[in-house]
Amino acid sequence: MAQDLHLENIRREYSSRSLSRKELPDDPLEMVDQWLKEALETQVNEPTAMIVATATPDGRPSVRTVLLKEVVGGRFVFYSNYESRKGRQMAENPHVAVTFLWHELERQIHVEGTVTRLSPEESDAYFAMRPYKSRVGARISPQSQPIPSREYIMMRFASESLRFVGREVPRPDNWGGYAVTPSRIEFWQGRDSRLHDRFLYELQPDGHWDLHRLAP
């Protein structure tokens, strides 16, 4: 039996930065761009990692970490297997939430919005850029499904790798891109005494963003 864990005394103070209203542009995507660039420049661990939460139509949630590949046209783009758990949930319920967490900068961005698939042409273009082994892996993995062993998946990988030696590896039909169109974006900056700076942008019907400071 697992032992109880008592973690009440584990805490740290956040004090390296602040965030004020005057720093924030009218368009939150400009701030996303600024914070992403700072995360890349300061070489934080996995700066493009984003936590994606999905849910079934009856509200049963699941969450995982994927890698952001682009922010284009105001949308957050990532790629996955359409038949994975998240792929099935997004097909049934397009409402998703995304979090970027950069411990080193004591920052988070929270995004809520709806997700759509990219076109086959867009998915093909990105798939062709992936390393050879990643393309092969995408073809042979029944993502999120039970498998008998590690050896099973490695045998499939070896077989498919030999099949495409010296040839172009085509994108499988069950793999491609997703784009999250945001309707809410929150910027969170850690502060001391847990009095964090939080600002929420909410998209309005006329296309402009309302901005509010939130209580920590």
Name every feature range the model reports, one short phrase each.
Residues 1-216:
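Binding-site signature for planar aromatic cofactors or substrates
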